[in-house]
Amino acid sequence: MEPERLKFGGPRELCGAADLISQFKLVQHHEFFCKKSLPVSLSDSHYLHNVVGDTEIRKGEGMQLDQLIESISQSRETNIRIQPFDIDELQESFQLNDMTPVELPPAEKGAPTIPSKSKSESKDRDRKHKKHKDRDKDKDREHKKHKHKHKDRSKDKDKDKDRDRKKDKNGHHDSGDHSKKHHDKKRKHDGDEDLNDVQRHKKNKHKSSKLDEVGAIRVAG
């Protein structure tokens, strides 16, 4: 059975994390760098007090750089100044020889590199492409709108034609009815006139017969 310390990547600490120091054999380095007591010059610095805390560090009056530098006396004695580079020394250090241009055979030459376009050119191209795209969209929108209007206009024309056709049909039907009514009225009027003529003829005949009778009586008397 596998021992507990070798499970899950090796032995674990109290917090549950793996003991990487023992696993990677860093105990000696850990003892040398981490467990070694700090020098007095470092432990007295106010910088460590601000970073680490009050643990075994006496409070200082502020961070002092001379406590962190052991050879501060030597650094003060040396004359520190910035000097510019000497061109002659640089030329002696880096000798540049003029050489003839190297001609490679075609087999060893690589593919020619196409110079990449600058960002401004690519932006201009993208902007132009976007403008053309927007213009095409506007054209398509106008075309659709015009097509829709033309379709609505044709629908209205068809509706007007159907309305006129129905109107003409109704007008023709009404004219037929009107002519029929007029014809019936005329026939009725003609019939009434004929009836009046017959009655008038009868009255005249009856009147003439009466006159004949009166004349005959007068002659006889």
Swiss-Prot record:
It is found in: Nucleus. GO terms for molecular function: transcription coregulator activity. Component of the Mediator complex. Interacts with FIB2. It comes from the Eukaryota. GO terms for cellular component: mediator complex. This is Mediator of RNA polymerase II transcription subunit 19a. Component of the Mediator complex, a coactivator involved in the regulated transcription of nearly all RNA polymerase II-dependent genes. Mediator functions as a bridge to convey information from gene-specific regulatory proteins to the basal RNA polymerase II transcription machinery. The Mediator complex, having a compact conformation in its free form, is recruited to promoters by direct interactions with regulatory proteins and serves for the assembly of a functional preinitiation complex with RNA polymerase II and the general transcription factors. Residues 142-152, 179-188 have a biased composition (Basic residues). Belongs to the plant Mediator complex subunit 19 family. It comes from Arabidopsis thaliana. Keywords: Nucleus, Transcription, Transcription regulation. Residues 101-221 are annotated as: Disordered. InterPro entries: Mediator_Med19_met. Disulfide bonds: none annotated.
